[in-house]
């Protein structure tokens, strides 16, 4: 049996903190306004994993009203979601993440993001795709006010 999940996340820029995307620190003059580290890529991917198995969403499991998640590394959240996937008897078929940002440029960091995600999901880097695009300077992402990310996860029942 296979299951497919979709995830979405968005964060605005505005805090003096490191910019973390896909588990990688991306050099930029500002970070995200967020309760956790604000990693939009891992948040969308976490939601995709949870959605594939009807396990709710990131806000249900890790509410931003709970101080234990304040400034938490989003890799911890992703790994916990994946633990739940494994508990249900599934493994990764593949994941695909799309980062929508005018700035900063993602291309130099994509290979590192893929490696981090593959490590956390205990799969091959060939099962992880990360790509980036812009909105051609349209909307808040086009004005470099923040970043949007979408993710899809295909889960396969373990034998």
Curated annotation (Swiss-Prot):
Keywords: Isoprene biosynthesis, Lyase, Metal-binding. SUPFAM superfamilies: IpsF-like (SSF69765). Binds 1 divalent metal cation per subunit. Its cofactor is a divalent metal cation. Pfam families: YgbB. Its EC number is 4.6.1.12. Pathway: Isoprenoid biosynthesis; isopentenyl diphosphate biosynthesis via DXP pathway; isopentenyl diphosphate from 1-deoxy-D-xylulose 5-phosphate: step 4/6. The record marks 35, 134 as: Transition state stabilizer. It comes from the Bacteria. A divalent metal cation binds at residues 9, 11, 43. One of its GO terms (molecular function) is metal ion binding. 4-CDP-2-C-methyl-D-erythritol 2-phosphate binds at residues 9-11, 35-36, 57-59, 62-66, 133-136, 140, 143. Gene3D superfamilies: 2-C-methyl-D-erythritol 2,4-cyclodiphosphate synthase (3.30.1330.50). PANTHER family: 2-C-METHYL-D-ERYTHRITOL 2,4-CYCLODIPHOSPHATE SYNTHASE, CHLOROPLASTIC. Involved in the biosynthesis of isopentenyl diphosphate (IPP) and dimethylallyl diphosphate (DMAPP), two major building blocks of isoprenoid compounds. Catalyzes the conversion of 4-diphosphocytidyl-2-C-methyl-D-erythritol 2-phosphate (CDP-ME2P) to 2-C-methyl-D-erythritol 2,4-cyclodiphosphate (ME-CPP) with a corresponding release of cytidine 5-monophosphate (CMP). HAMAP family: IspF. This is 2-C-methyl-D-erythritol 2,4-cyclodiphosphate synthase. It comes from Mannheimia succiniciproducens (strain KCTC 0769BP / MBEL55E). The lineage of its organism: Bacteria, Pseudomonadati, Pseudomonadota, Gammaproteobacteria, Pasteurellales.
């Amino acid at each position: 049996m296979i299951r497919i999940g979709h995830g979405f996340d968005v964060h605005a820029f505005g805090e003096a903190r490191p910019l973390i995307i896909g588990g990688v620190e991306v050099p930029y003059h500002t970070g995200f306004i967020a309760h956790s580290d604000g990693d939009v890529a891992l948040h969308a991917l976490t939601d995709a994993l949870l959605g594939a198995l009807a396990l709710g969403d990131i806000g249900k499991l890790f509410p931003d009203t709970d101080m234990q998640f304040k400034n938490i590394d989003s890799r911890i959240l992703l790994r916990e979601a994946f633990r739940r996937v494994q508990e249900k008897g599934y493994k990764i078929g593949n994941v695909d993440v799309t980062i929508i940002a005018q700035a900063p440029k993602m291309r130099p960091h994509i290979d590192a993001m893929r490696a981090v995600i593959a490590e956390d999901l205990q799969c091959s880097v060939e099962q992880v795709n990360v790509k980036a695009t812009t909105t051609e300077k349209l909307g808040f992402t086009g004005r470099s006010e923040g970043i949007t990310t979408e993710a899809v996860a295909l889960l396969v029942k373990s034998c």
